[in-house]
Amino acid sequence: YLIESIGDVDLSSIKSVNASRFRDHLIAKGLASTSIRRVLSSVKAIYNLASKELGIANPNPFSGIFIPEDNAASERLPVPLDAIRLIQHECFQVDDPQRWLIAIISDTGMRLSEAAGLLTEDIKLDADVPHITLRKHPWRSLKTASSERDIPLVGSAYEAAIRIVDVGHKYAFARYCDETKCNANSASAALNKWLKQRIPEGCVIHSFRHSLRDRLRAVERPSDSIDAIGGWTTAGIGHKYGSGYDLAVKYRWMKMLER
């Protein structure tokens, strides 16, 4: 992103005007304000480290950059079911790891970073209920405590999981993940570019997560059970008691999405 915006320039020559141009470049690429903050935070940290190593005393030009708010969260739309089915079909026609990532998200509702940061061993195909064990890893944290969960594999997610396990790489999506980091920003840019011509305006890769919630509502699943599958935080006190929903129960609900 940075080199695209300002070129491959000497670190000491980067000024606040370059940082502002970089921000404008990210906005033009369609990134939400939260994503822009995340990218700028990473670049700022890299600049701090590199300037110390090289003895550059200039103030960090990426500090204090204004980032306008947007309405991306409220305007983000679910992907219609007919579009989901067409995309899933095309994913297996192309049949590469990037398309498997889309397919696995489309029928699990995982956040992009959750899926991109998986180990292949997190995929449990030989269990009584095929599922993904979603846990924190050193290279990828989880958003909330409720994000840690077991997700049944059905439909296109199951088909993608078979292919990932057959490849046998340590990381499910090695293009975006290694032992030091999970590059969800890079994955987001690439996948949204491919999806742009295939989904309605206002939809992005994260929209599959919104769609899953709507699809589970359509088969009359209780709200707290939907939260358990998607890793959303459930409001109220009652959800803190008991052991939650059994994986086999969640699997039966998820199988309804194949109809």
What are these regions (language model features)?
Residues 154-201:
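Active-site/catalytic core of tyrosine-dependent DNA strand-transfer enzymes
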Residues 78, 158, 178-179, 230-259:
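Catalytic-site neighborhood detector that most strongly recognizes the C-terminal catalytic loop/helix
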Residues 48-59, 105-129, 223-228:
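Short, charged phosphate-coordinating catalytic segments
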